[in-house]
């Protein structure tokens, strides 16, 4: 007989198995977060309490790699409510000591040390797998992974060391028991994990999270030794005899440190009525901020040796895991709304029958992308399980009952590109154009130019960024409702556009499409835009998305900057005549600049009067090419003169790569970029200077960036020192511009053959 509840359970079981393989065995990227996974398991347990989904945690590795673990690595029962916490605490005597450890979000493993007299220690390493079978990853120890210091193991098999040096920490029974073991085996459970600092410094631009980084190296046939050196083995449990306890947790931590490993952060608490899920949640949030590693919960253990139970396939009773969980609810989909992004991508929003989660009424959730809607058959009538935790956007945990085929509605005018659907119409809709313009202005910090205001400007005929930047305020103020826009918003917008760097303007225009924002664009060397190696982008991306449209993007950026400066001058002086120091550092062409004849580029020639020969145009335009940073020679050919251009000078800060630590300064970043330098968010091998707010000597603890600079002998400058150097270089450039302006060419025109 068909049982719909049993069918639902089997569907969710397949989803759980897929998630287990991705998370524990590194088969692809994780398909759901830890919270989504826990909610899925809870719901499956409600459907089938006898299914055992809560006791089986992990995934069996492939048969070719699986081995039986030397010691079972059982999971932990989870506590989520105060009622569950109270029931667990009733099992222990009052004033019992509790150990509260960080629950690290890494790759769980088991290290087995075999120690014998007069023999080098033998170390084996295993992944947890499903708790019974795992994978032998001992080979990683030959590629740079460290789980301890070898020289310490000699002391562990030295009976004198145990009796004299460590005797004050161990009881006589433990020492006697250890000495009688013919072959001494130490089992240490721990976590392979990368510190948050190292991940943010070196790997955040290449990997989704630290766990993906470690999992990928563990499952690689040829792991990267440099990455393995950054992976820490953090121990949290030590067993010497699988049948009996041998030491207290204080001694356990001492032994961890003696073998050269830093144990997991642990706090000791007395069991009392004041301990609650609320106090644990507060403590967890504090540890998430302070911990060296990513953590996803707490492990709470009773510190009592008499409770020791031989490791088996059952979850321990004296230890539980505490996590902050979001609530879940079942609801029905009413319809799917498709909205266009600024990049012409359709983004789905799923509307549902309103339900209450954590005291908040939820009526819609994110649909992720087109493939998610299509594959999961989400449409009118679909029954879904949703979740919400804290301020996280509500989303679907699982689809309990899919919609009928005819109710799964996708955009009719769309085309598939990967997992997304893109608009494929002949004309760009109003929705996309407005979002593009809003993104431009908000990216540059222009106040007041949001969706409603920009939409009204669009309806009034201002349908491009250029149209708004170049708007005539006298005409705009005559349109009903646009007085404040013309008098206040536009002038402040011109200031922001005028002072923006070329990279910021390109990013604001979304010039190279979605996925290539300011962080990646900043890595493009404007002096060599055709270079195929750009940090953060593949060679294919540069070849197909950057270089083919570089000149067009550059021309548009030049025009916008020139237009904004002209508007500001017009507002201040009533004239749009460019000033002598108005040349923008990335190749601007003023309206009164005429292109001069050149073999490789267009040089600028300011025309103040007709040429001596009476020609209408003082310069003869020739074939143009926009390689504006090429340093080849140029000449201005007229009927009466030929002006040879000097070679282009190197920008004063070209080759300087700065990183700021403990402060941000957008204006200073723009000034450095204008002088040819770069400012990065994180340190890497290209950084030349690290900038601090204070002058040396520097107080400990050092920031990660400062420590990197000191370890690698980089320049460390104070903010005051950097600002003085930038000011000096800017003053030099101003003097050079004035000098060039006073040096007329033989044809009676002031020729600017050198760009700053």
Swiss-Prot record:
Residues 648-742 form the BRCT domain. Its EC number is 6.5.1.2. The keyword Nucleotide-binding does not apply. The active site is at residue 103. Keywords: DNA replication, Ligase, NAD. The keyword Calcium does not apply. Residues 610-630 are annotated as: Disordered. It holds the Pfam family BRCT. GO terms for biological process: DNA repair; DNA replication. It is an enzyme of class 6 (ligase). It catalyses: NAD(+) + (deoxyribonucleotide)n-3'-hydroxyl + 5'-phospho-(deoxyribonucleotide)m = (deoxyribonucleotide)n+m + AMP + beta-nicotinamide D-nucleotide. PROSITE patterns: BRCT (PS50172). GO terms for molecular function: DNA ligase (NAD+) activity. InterPro entries: BRCT_dom (IPR001357), BRCT_dom_sf (IPR036420), DNAligase_adenylation (IPR013839), DNAligase_N (IPR013840), NA-bd_OB-fold (IPR012340), NAD_DNA_ligase_OB (IPR004150). Residues 610-620 have a biased composition (Low complexity). Catalyzes the formation of phosphodiester linkages between 5'-phosphoryl and 3'-hydroxyl groups in double-stranded DNA using NAD as a coenzyme and as the energy source for the reaction. Belongs to the NAD-dependent DNA ligase family. This is Putative DNA ligase 052L.
